[in-house]
């Protein structure tokens, strides 16, 4: 059989990547198999092989995103295949390598490592000609800065991603990307305590997700609405949206179901509705075990010690220590405040002061986060 030019295979990989970014699973799977067959008869080209390996890694990330309840293959294997040891990479390939490594580290909660890779990728962003591909990079930067509570940096990047995706919203292919951008925008507004600006974005996201029939995105929209109303102090509305989120998360197999149960348990416990709190706590533990979610297992453990097992201050303090890292600081801040208020209500002021100080410690660590990745 006559060999296939590497440029032809490269163009097919580009098309494959477009389907991956649009979450077109069926088309992406078909192209993946077609390209695999063509690689066997392609003219020798190291860059094309590396490009395929990178897209294969990105394909696995897409599958994990659209099927969060399923265990996927070890993505670290893909990264080891594209380390580039002894290989000279082009500018665009350097961009992809660092960008996808950043995504991988982010998925593990390694935010500082992820930012380091994203920064390397950003230096090669001028090699990326496609506006929507640059928007993907901007979105990922905004996402990680949001999780690190670096609100203004997150807003800087999300604005660029949002406008790029919204400009292409008419064909319906990038509606999900617009929804994702709205989640980040709303989360940043919540962190700025301007909740009235967050709610419209989340309601737009909810409506869009309903129109698309996307239960996973709808579950996230309802969860975020519940969280925003909780931050506003409107517990009844928060409960309303969180309860609605449960069904959508169950139907879509969303791992966010654990977070929804955690939020419901916390709200009921704070309202002194012990039995309801215990009910959702138990569901949360089940869900955390099913999804192997150690992070929310730690959060639920704090609720257990505080509300179900006698509120021993040393045990609660030890449980909060598990959240003493860059991913856990926002939750440490919230749960330390919850603990301080709990002990204030029962008249244990020494313990209350201790947990207030723990909250202040978490706030300081969040503020320090912006300096951790600077040289």
Residue ranges and their predicted role:
Residues 1-101, 281, 323-326, 331-375:
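Flexible inter-repeat linkers and adjacent short helices
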Residues 15, 56-58, 101, 141, ...:
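Structural register within alpha-helical repeat arrays
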Residues 19, 60, 98, 105, ...:
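Residue at a conserved register position within TPR or TPR-like alpha-solenoid repeats
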Residues 20-36, 64-81, 109-120, 150-163, ...:
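Helix-turn-helix repeat elements of alpha-solenoid scaffolds
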